[in-house]
Amino acid sequence: MFALENLKEDKRMKKWMYDCVLETPATAEAMFKNKDALVGKLVDLFLAKDYKKIVMVASGSSYNIANCSKYAIQNYLGVKVDLINSVTYAKYDYKFHENALVICMSQSGKSTNTIEAVIKAKECGNDVVAISMVPDSPITRYCDTVLEYGSYGPGDDVFVCRGVPTSTLYFILFALEAGVKKGAYPKDSYKKRMKEIEMIIHEMPRIREAIDQWYNANKEELWSMK
């Protein structure tokens, strides 16, 4: 394990990045067990209309989440997914997405660019969903349909390193549930993927421990690199 004890003598920081890494498997496991309730609303929204594509609008860590989940969503749902930076969407790209479900993503719910994108999507008459990690965040005041990833917990994930893998999991679970209900993804493949996801979550602590061991065995060489 990384040596954090000395760093934690600085009392200004309640939680370190590695603490959030340690919390990720338990958060992912809880989300997986609660997947029906967690992604159910987004599944219902998507299935309510014959959307031709999904537009994921995001920046920062949310953009990474969208990148991680884009191709899984396309594969499981059988619809095109566009990934657009929040500023680009709000300033230039908001006009070109007919028959699309626009998902505006902000981990904190405070991104002013993503909030502006929500406003633009509504002005264009698009169906828009805002999703964040934090309940009652500022973005909730600008969108009628607001969802939560289900990964928020006491102490918050100030580094968003817990949020990236768990929020990616949220979208993969959404796509699988919606895909099988839509008939776009076979039931036997759905069951196989769910078992794989459960196995991956279970193995996350072991993988992290193996990475710790590798790092400690090679850190001198890594530190010497220029």
Feature names for model-found ranges:
Residues F2-A30:
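N-terminal amphipathic/basic leader segments beginning at the initiator methionine
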Residues D10, K14-M17, Y51-S59, E209, ...:
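Glycine-rich phosphate/diphosphate-binding loops and the adjacent beta-loop-alpha structural elements
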Residues W16, F174-Y215:
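Internal, active-site/partner-interface "lid" segment
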Residues A26-K33, G78-D82:
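Short coil-to-helix leader/linker segments, especially the first N-terminal amphipathic alpha-helix
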Residues E29-N34, L38-L47, K195-K226:
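Cofactor-pocket helix-loop regions in the catalytic cores of large enzyme subunits
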Residues A37-G40, L47-R193:
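Glycine-rich phosphate-binding loops that contact phosphosugars or nucleotide phosphates
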